Amino acid sequence: MLVPKRVKHRREFRGKMRGYAKGGDTISFGEYGLQATTSHWITNRQIEAARIAMTRYMKRNGQVWIKIFPHKSYTAKAIGVRMGSGKGAPEGWVAPVKRGVVMFELGGVDEATAREALRLASHKLPVKTKFVKRGEA
């Protein structure tokens, strides 16, 4: 699973998810991509589940590029703990994805296979997505 090797601060502010992506909105490695049309936090477990869904469908043919990385930690307090007494312990890692970001890219397979593999991956993600080809995104 994807996690940072080391971070400067264990706990981060939540931040804002307004507007479109400033970068990462084009296909740069493969021929086909999965582009987010809404903004959301995507956990490292969701990224891994999407990767497994794609590679299993393609039967190890072609190549998958993951273009997002979960660099932001999120915290949670234990169940039954009252408010106050500081921020909770780090719970996991997320990748803040804005709309317009190409999250996954595929290459080395035909369009029908890529479309179906990315459709299966999109069911594992909490964002609405669309299939894009090189030159379109």
UniProtKB/Swiss-Prot annotation:
InterPro entries noted in UniProt: Ribosomal_uL16 (IPR047873), Ribosomal_uL16_bact-type (IPR000114), Ribosomal_uL16_CS (IPR020798), Ribosomal_uL16_dom (IPR016180), Ribosomal_uL16_sf (IPR036920)
Keywords associated with the record: Ribonucleoprotein, Ribosomal protein, RNA-binding, rRNA-binding, tRNA-binding
Gene Ontology BP, a term: translation
Subunit annotation: Part of the 50S ribosomal subunit.
Function: Binds 23S rRNA and is also seen to make contacts with the A and possibly P site tRNAs.
Family in the record: Belongs to the universal ribosomal protein uL16 family.
Protein name: Large ribosomal subunit protein uL16
Gene that specifies this protein: rplP
